[in-house]
């Protein structure tokens, strides 16, 4: 036997409108309200359901007005046990999440419930903010061009990240997006010293648990808030979890005037959840089955991730590329909003080179002399030229063999192979798997090393010496060891 109750009290004790559920189809719930008390779009609604296992409160978000006093809402939790005729109450506002210093070190779901409170522990947040907010006014925006040094050679040299910018990590399944984003959390949170917010959007629960354990072990969790809506959650939760995390980040930026790091893994799942919700609401699909509002939804999220005067949100977003197809509307729509792209390539990971960054496809808007300096730009351009020439020659090598190349091209191929291997690097996030300690290489050392390699100073070093090493000192040590053995 199931009994259901609903109170008539809204937030702050005000009288809330109550309605009645008239239809339930999976996560889609239709409710009828009095004509003069219709809830607004995006308002949160609550319904209390008592099951044999105890009572639970479902949160619904109004998505459509159907006419005839009916609203259609998307549930943020499974609707098991919800039946027609149950009373539902309008809270009078959109979903809100806790904000402030008390959220650091805690894990939340999309509706702001804390998931890792100890027995007897309570959370006293500074405030609650609505997750649907306007982007900062144009007059308040402040473009940033300062480089965010990561200590990862391939990124710092060829696709440098922007402080206060939006960075995309593109790649298909299993090429290392989550490992790289975990690596960036460890590196940047340690060196950056600011506040971090992590949004787990539609990814594996195991990865979420691993991330919490790693952050606790490395000591960065006390400066981080985590918001999870994993792949076993309803589409409504996966669609809103990024907004919930972004709202927490905006509070640190706008009220506490802090520099904030926002990590989103995975932005494709945000798009995917939007597609599911769009289908559930009966909208006509657009290209490749995506929602017709894809560009609008992506823009609403990305336009809020920005720099305002004095402080910024720096965002790293993992972006799954379906079937490695970069023309798919989901990754293609995201490209336009990014300041830097790091493309992870399966053919590079197949060679055992990690991080498996494609040096020719990755890009950054600040890789220009006026932003990174003339020497950095010149070295990066020369490295790309050598790698591009090697790529152009690969068909000839495959058919005729390397012996048929000119002496100049043979030299180029040798240097390209050394550069390709030197772009690999041991990471802190993979230490437990590889047993090899991660390395951080300052940008000046990175530029100096690649300048010497591209000019031929290390042509006599064996190629294997360049593989998975840190800076110049590490390279020279490995080369001496290998030459002594040989």
Swiss-Prot record:
GO terms for cellular component: plasma membrane; proton-transporting ATP synthase complex. ATP binds at residues 171-178. It catalyses: ATP + H2O + 4 H(+)(in) = ADP + phosphate + 5 H(+)(out). It is a peripheral membrane protein. It is an enzyme of class 7 (translocase). It is found in: Cell membrane. Keywords: ATP synthesis, ATP-binding, Cell membrane, CF(1), Hydrogen ion transport, Ion transport, Membrane, Nucleotide-binding, Translocase, Transport. GO terms for molecular function: ATP binding; ATP hydrolysis activity; proton-transporting ATP synthase activity, rotational mechanism. Its main location: membrane. Its EC number is 7.1.2.2. Belongs to the ATPase alpha/beta chains family. F-type ATPases have 2 components, CF(1) - the catalytic core - and CF(0) - the membrane proton channel. CF(1) has five subunits: alpha(3), beta(3), gamma(1), delta(1), epsilon(1). CF(0) has three main subunits: a(1), b(2) and c(9-12). The alpha and beta chains form an alternating ring which encloses part of the gamma chain. CF(1) is attached to CF(0) by a central stalk formed by the gamma and epsilon chains, while a peripheral stalk is formed by the delta and b chains. Produces ATP from ADP in the presence of a proton gradient across the membrane. The catalytic sites are hosted primarily by the beta subunits. NCBIfam families: atpD. This is ATP synthase subunit beta. It comes from Salinispora tropica (strain ATCC BAA-916 / DSM 44818 / JCM 13857 / NBRC 105044 / CNB-440).
């Amino acid at each position: 036997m199931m009994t259901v109750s609903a109170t008539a009290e809204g937030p702050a004790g005000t009288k809330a409108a109550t309605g009645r559920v008239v239809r339930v189809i999976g996560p889609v719930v239709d409710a009828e309200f009095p004509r003069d008390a219709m809830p607004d779009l995006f308002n949160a609604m609550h319904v209390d359901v008592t099951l044999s296992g105890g009572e639970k409160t479902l949160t619904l978000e109004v998505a459509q007005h159907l006419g005839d006093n009916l609203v259609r809402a998307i549930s943020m939790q499974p609707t098991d046990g919800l039946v027609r005729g149950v009373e539902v109450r309008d809270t009078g506002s959109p979903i809100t999440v806790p904000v402030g210093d008390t959220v650091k070190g805690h894990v939340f779901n999309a509706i702001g419930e804390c998931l890792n409170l100890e027995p007897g522990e309570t959370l006293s947040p500074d405030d609650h903010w609505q997750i649907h907010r306007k982007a900062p006014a144009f007059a308040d925006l402040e473009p940033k061009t300062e480089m965010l040094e990561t200590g990862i050679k391939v990124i710092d040299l060829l696709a440098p990240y922007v402080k206060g910018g939006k960075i995309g990590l593109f790649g298909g399944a299993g090429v290392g997006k989550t490992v790289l984003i975990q690596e960036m959390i460890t590196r940047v949170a340690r060196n950056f010293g600011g506040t971090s917010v992590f949004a787990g959007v539609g990814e594996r629960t195991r990865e979420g648990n691993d991330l919490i354990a790693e952050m606790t072990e490395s000591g960065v969790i006390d400066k981080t808030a985590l918001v999870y809506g994993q792949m076993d959650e309803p589409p409504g939760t996966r669609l809103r979890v990024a907004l919930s995390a972004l709202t927490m980040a905006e509070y640190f930026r706008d009220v506490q005037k802090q520099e904030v790091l926002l990590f989103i893994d995975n932005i494709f799942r945000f798009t995917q959840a939007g597609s599911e919700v769009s289908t559930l609401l009966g909208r006509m699909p657009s290209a490749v089955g995506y929602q017709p509002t894809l560009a609008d939804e992506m823009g609403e999220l990305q336009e809020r991730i920005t720099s305002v005067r004095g402080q910024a949100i720096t965002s790293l977003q993992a972006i799954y590329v379906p079937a490695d197809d970069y023309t798919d509307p989901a990754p293609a729509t995201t490209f336009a909003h990014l300041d830097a792209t790091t493309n992870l390539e399966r053919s590079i990971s197949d060679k055992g080179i990690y991080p498996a960054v494609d040096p020719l496809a990755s890009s950054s808007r600040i890789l220009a002399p006026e932003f990174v300096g003339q020497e950095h730009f010149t070295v990066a351009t020369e490295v790309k030229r050598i790698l591009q020439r090697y790529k152009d020659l690969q068909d000839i090598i495959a058919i005729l063999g390397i012996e048929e190349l000119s002496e100049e091209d043979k030299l180029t191929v040798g240097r390209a192979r050394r550069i390709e291997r030197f772009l690999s690097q041991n990471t802190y996030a993979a230490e437990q798997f590889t047993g090899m300690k991660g390395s951080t290489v300052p940008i000046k050392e990175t530029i100096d090393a690649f300048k010497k390699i591209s000019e031929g100073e290390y042509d006599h070093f064996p190629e294997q010496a360049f593989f998975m090493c840190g800076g110049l000192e590490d390279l020279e040590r490995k080369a001496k060891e290998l030459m002594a053995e040989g």
